[in-house]
Design a protein with these regions (language model features):
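Conserved beta-strand-loop-alpha-helix junction that forms the acyl-donor binding cleft
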Residues: 114-123, 142-145
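Conserved active-site alpha-helix within GNAT-family acetyltransferase domains
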Residues: 94, 118-137
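Short hydrophobic/aromatic beta-strand or adjacent loop that forms the aromatic wall/cage
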Residues: 47, 136-140
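Conserved acetyl-CoA-binding loop-helix of GNAT-fold acetyltransferases
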Residues: 80-83, 89-102, 125, 129
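Acetyl-CoA-dependent GNAT
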Residues: 4-6, 10-74, 79, 84, ...
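Conserved GNAT acetyl-CoA-binding A-motif
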Residues: 104-116
């Protein structure tokens, strides 16, 4: 994990092509144009998009933000964590998660939540291996607009 820490940085607009590819690998197809439009989030002080660089390009990213709700103290929440297929199992996911935790602590947050699709077993095993614990099971509903 330590070897990756020096390769993690804040995202830039020119990362859009790689972020689109990585998002698609995760199962959320996105075009470069769509990602460029979404990168307006880089201006949000309560959000951080961290990218890991490798010799062969962008190896992964993590999207973390402050979640503010009426019913509890603010907490950090991971919106997405993607490690490119060639880099899985090399400690990059743990390094990205540690960087997101550092970012959250620096903002005085005491919790970092990560939601993982119940159908994806691999991420569950990863999160438990790096010390995360399950705090709730839930369903996500979408209301048609």
């Amino acid at each position: 994990m330590q070897e990756w820490r020096s390769h993690i940085r804040g995202a830039r607009h020119d990362d859009a092509p790689a972020l689109a590819e990585l998002s698609t690998q995760l199962g959320y197809p996105a075009t470069e144009a769509q990602v460029r439009e979404r990168l307006c989030l880089l201006d949000d002080p309560e959000r951080e998009l961290l990218v890991a660089d490798a010799q062969d390009g962008r190896a992964g990213f993590i999207d973390v933000h402050v979640q503010r709700v009426v019913e509890s103290e603010p907490y950090g929440e991971v919106g997405g964590l993607v490690v490119g297929a060639p880099h899985r199992g090399a400690g990059l996911g743990a390094a990205l998660l540690a960087a997101a935790a550092d970012w959250s602590r620096a903002r005085g947050l005491e919790r970092l939540w990560i939601r993982a699709n119940l159908a994806r077993v691999g991420p569950h095993e990863f999160y438990e291996a790096v010390g995360c614990r399950v705090v709730k099971d839930q369903r996500v509903y979408e209301y048609p607009l």
